[in-house]
Amino acid sequence: MPREIKEIKEFLIKARRKDAKSVKIKKNPTNVKFKVRCSRFLYTLVITDKEKAEKLKQSLPPGLQVKEIKCRKSKTTP
């Protein structure tokens, strides 16, 4: 089940939990989404500042599996 987190500190606490398995980082042109998979919930944090996103990426726990996903350009047909 998905849950959205608004605070960076709260996200880091969730990422350091024992049941946190992996983090997916989705980069879009307007924002960066961090998704941490825990046993019960998938916690999502949306950051619009690219510098804060890089700092958060560096402060993730080292034992956690991190996967980066870049956005695709959507094809708009007239």
From Swiss-Prot:
Q: Which UniProt keywords are listed?
A: Ribonucleoprotein, Ribosomal protein
Q: Which GO terms describe its biological process?
A: protein-RNA complex assembly; translation
**One GO molecular function term?**
structural constituent of ribosome
Superkingdom, according to UniProt? Eukaryota
Entry-linked Pfam families: Ribosomal_L38e
GO cellular component, alphabetical, reads:
cytosolic large ribosomal subunit
In Swiss-Prot or TrEMBL terms, this protein is called: Large ribosomal subunit protein eL38
List the InterPro entries hit by this protein, alphabetically. Answer: Ribosomal_eL38, Ribosomal_eL38_sf
So what family is this one in?
Belongs to the eukaryotic ribosomal protein eL38 family.
